[in-house]
Amino acid sequence: MGAKPRVGLFVTCLVDLFRPSVGFAAIKLIEESGCTVDVPMAQTCCGQPAYNSGDRADTRALAESTIEAFEGYDYVVAPSGSCAGMLKKHYPGLFKGEPVWEARAKAFSDKVHELVSFLVDVRGVARVAARHAGTFTYHDSCSGLRELGIQAQPRALLASMEGLKLVEMQEADVCCGFGGTFCVKYPDISNAIVEKKTGNIDASGAETLLAGDLGCLMNMAGKLKRQGSRVEARHVAEVLAGMTDQPPIGGERSR
């Protein structure tokens, strides 16, 4: 029997700082798919905020350190379509005209996968053992859907869970208004977008909102809370792993 594939988990800034439980859920799911998981301590930001702001020098520096930190692994997995999209789609272009670094970036990007896509498309996971009663709706993040083609995969795994009912909101594939630094630079536009999104979430009748990107979830959860909605928000990894003992995103920890 061959050695298990080695996965380097790219935790992401938001998961590290605001929702570590997503990282632990990701580790559980990856291990259950038959892999070993490490969390390289040298990792930092993927560089997307700098990249979207036009700061190629800092983005490149972050890319170099990330590539070096993960080169020894068979796969690089991130519980975020946004960060995975940055690592997979944009790193090679930072090194155009530099054959050595461009080749390293290409080899790195070929190993990068978003978490749920990795489970379904790479490891062939068709169902999970976790159970969870309730009604859920799913938001497709812009980067996950448009850069990586992630849409059917999370729904397939959620459909395999006993007790879980998935209902589709209207325009599930439309932006939530977060967009990283977009929500800071254009707050009025961002607010109008998320207001429409939360209206669709409430109208779905779901008790819980799921998504694969913590930035989107924090944005939508904040708006739902300000509107007085009873809908809770969770990262899809937590539900798939059966690790829902933490308060919902934006919720208060019990004392």
Over which residues does each language-model region extend?
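Iron-sulfur cluster-binding electron-transfer modules in prokaryotic oxidoreductases
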Residues: 1-255
